[in-house]
């Protein structure tokens, strides 16, 4: 059975619901979890380079705060369930690659993540990190398709 589960999050409500299910699953099989968040790289196109340094620093600060908030939620859920947990925060424009790398580096034997279930052209245009993980992972991937109709809208 699985002993170490990677739980990637993008901070969405669906992802948060998958994290809760992932922690419950980990508890039921005696596994530990690693929470994971990939923050985007800083990209700006401007001719006013004197503004960039402050903007970049603020972007990094905001990204760290967001990651810390998402990862703290995973750690708290795991602690409440009595499940061992550590967290990983990286910066990457290619979250699926970072997810796969973290799973390997941490010795995970399962990746459990949410899917928004976008289909057709919308799914292709928006891209699906879950789909990319599924097609590139050498590890098993458990995809949680929550009922988005039951989730409350983001404010």
Q: Where is each model-derived feature located?
A:
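Acidic, proline/glycine-rich short linear motifs
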Residues: 38-69, 150-155
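Short, hinge-like loop/turn segments at secondary-structure boundaries
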Residues: 50-54, 103-106, 129-130
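Glycine-rich, Arg-bearing micro-motifs that act as flexible, cationic patches
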Residues: 110-136, 150-153
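Short, acidic/small-residue loops that bind anionic groups at enzyme active sites
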Residues: 136-145
């Amino acid at each position: 059975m699985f002993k170490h589960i990677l739980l990637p999050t993008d901070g969405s409500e669906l992802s948060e619901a998958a994290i809760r299910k992932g922690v419950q699953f980990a508890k039921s099989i005696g596994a530990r979890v690693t929470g994971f968040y990939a923050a985007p790289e800083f990209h700006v196109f401007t001719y006013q380079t004197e503004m960039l340094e402050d903007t970049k620093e603020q972007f990094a600060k905001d990204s760290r705060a967001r990651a810390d908030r998402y990862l703290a939620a995973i750690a708290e859920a795991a602690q409440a369930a009595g499940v061992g947990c550590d967290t990983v925060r990286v910066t990457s424009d290619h979250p699926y690659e970072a997810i796969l790398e973290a799973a390997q580096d941490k010795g995970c034997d399962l990746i459990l993540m949410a899917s928004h279930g976008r289909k057709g052209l919308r799914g292709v245009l928006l891209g699906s990190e879950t789909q990319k993980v599924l097609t590139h992972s050498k590890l098993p991937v458990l995809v949680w398709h929550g009922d988005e109709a039951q989730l409350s809208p983001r404010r």
